[in-house]
Amino acid sequence: VIGAIPALLALVIRARMKEPERWQKMKDSGALDRHSVFTYGELFRDPRWRRNAIVGMLLVCSGVIGLWGIGFFTPELIRTVLSKTYAAQGMTKEQIGPLVDKWASWGLLTLQVGAFFGMLSASWVAARLGRRKAFAIAFSTALIATACAFQFYTNASQTFWLIPIMGFFQLAVFAVYAIYLPELFPTHLRSTGTSFCYNVGRFLAAAGVPVIGMLKTEVFAHHPEPMRPAALVMCCVFLLGLIVLPFAPETKDKPLPEDERSFAH
């Protein structure tokens, strides 16, 4: 029942949401019918939108791999570390199991609490300093915070500060995606371009999960806690975002891009 509340809220918002004025004008003029407006072919035909789509997709890959390939393994880190801690204290497996599960759940919760405040802060930074600077700060701090969390987590109390700090910086970049990606494309390609960046980026990012699995079970199998070095290596994915960033156009205080052909009729 609780899970249905966001869906009901989405229905209310959708019913009250209006189409963008520019898009509505294009629809009323019939311009939409004269273009392949909802195809990837149209998106990649123009070098401007093609470049923006590739840049946006790579930026998304960096953040999503960081989250899926590292951040969402936080419960495993907590279970591994605390299981050893409690075993050293003389607890039985029957006692340890429920206890580490509880702390793993707290880890996911505090990660999301940190994410909430991180996204709010990143939105403010993007509005004040610009999108590229917001991305640079987000990727850099995500790398540092994630590496620190997976290297220095040693006790349950850190679940309430080290993990939310990681969530704050790791998911902050997703707020910048929401602002930046729609600003890269003209009206008739905005949804197509944004969905390409998100969905293709997420599809490619799915490779991060088996990669960290391989690092744990093969490359660092000899390590007493293979999750730690595996996560440290995976943190390099945030460098991808920083490498791509010089090719990303700054959109702060600039009008939304438009393809003049769309309004030529």
Predicted regions and their residues:
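Extracytoplasmic gate region of multi-pass secondary transporters
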Residues: 47-116, 205-209
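Multi-pass alpha-helical transporter architecture, strongest
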Residues: 10-16, 180, 235-262
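Interfacial helix-cap and linker-helix signal at transmembrane-aqueous boundaries
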Residues: 78-79, 125-126, 212-221
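Cytoplasmic membrane-interface "Motif A"-like loop-to-helix N-cap segments
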Residues: 127-139
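Hydrophobic core of transmembrane alpha-helices in multi-pass small-molecule transporters
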Residues: 158-172
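Flexible cytoplasmic inter-helical loops of multi-pass small-molecule transporters
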Residues: 15-39, 254-263
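A membrane-interface helix-boundary motif in multi-pass transporters
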Residues: 1-2, 216-236
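C-terminal ends and interior cores of transmembrane alpha-helices
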Residues: 140-154
